[in-house]
Structure formats: structure tokens, C-alpha cells
Amino acid sequence: MATVELGYDFTKTYTSLTPTPKDLDNTAPKLGTIFESTDGKAYRFVLNNHSSDLVIGDVVFLDKTASYPNAVSVLNTDSCGAVAAGVMAGAAMGAIPAAGYGWIQFAGVGSANWEGTTDIVLGDSLKGVNSQVYVVKDAALAATATYVNHMRALAAYTTNAAAVGTNNVAINCRVW
């Protein structure tokens, strides 16, 4: 089900910021548009500056190498540590095509992909992984976040399967 607030469908994606004559009433929001809801969730309209399509729940990083200030990518040179490198930006809200546009959630309770080869306890801090679309347990500190931009597990996960699954998280990726 689409998340719709005040006319925004956060699962809608666009291949261009320029409307076609058939699509004048469905123009893409301005790149960088931020929407904050009354329930603490926050969204940003971004460019997927990566060569692969994103799906709902994919974790993305701020692409500071891009010419656009609101571009995201799955690439991150140091797992969101250095300001000059990638910073975890949030989770994709829809299937954003490569070089396309769509919404990411950067704050509040949401869903994100996480990798489950390590037990995750409710409240554990989750950190991004370079060149991956998921978060993992921040094993060094468990409940204390290593990085300013992080996610927090809202469920326990003890399956220890290598597969990536989408689970509930508290997203805290406000620093850009």
C-alpha cells in the first residue's frame, strides 16, 4: 500500500524531472523536497545516482561525489564514517530506477533491509555496508551507535540466515 500524505505518494518514482504533455498533472517534486509528517517520519526526494535500480527498503548513502546535492547511491567508501565520504541517507520508499528519481525515508519508524547472519536484538544499532543495500548490526557497540546517521532495530532477529530481509527500524539519518 502506498504511503500518501498531502498529495505525495512516497512510492511513486520518476525517470525525469521534466513532465511530458501526457503527465503535466503528475510532475515530479523538486529535487531535495523534504516532507515531515506529524508522526515523526521524514522523507526526501532524491536522484538515484547509482547504476542499479533500487527497491523498497534498500539502504542508500548520500553521494557526495555527484554533481547534485540530493543524489544517493548504494556506494559508500567507509561505511558512513567520514564526512567526505558517504553518509547513510535512509531507505528507498519505492522502486527507484537507476538514474531515476524517488523518495527515501530518512527519519522515523520505517522498513529497511538488513542482513541476518548475526543475531540482532531489539534496540541494536544498525550501520550501513559499502556497496550493499542493507544494514548490519553494529557489533562493536550493539545498542550505542557508532555513526550519527544510523538505524535502530525494532525487532529481534535470530534466524542467522545469509538472506537479506526487510524489517522494522527506527531511521535516524538527518545529517546531510
Per-segment meaning from a language model:
Residues A2-W176:
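Glycine-anchored, exposed beta-strand/edge motif detector
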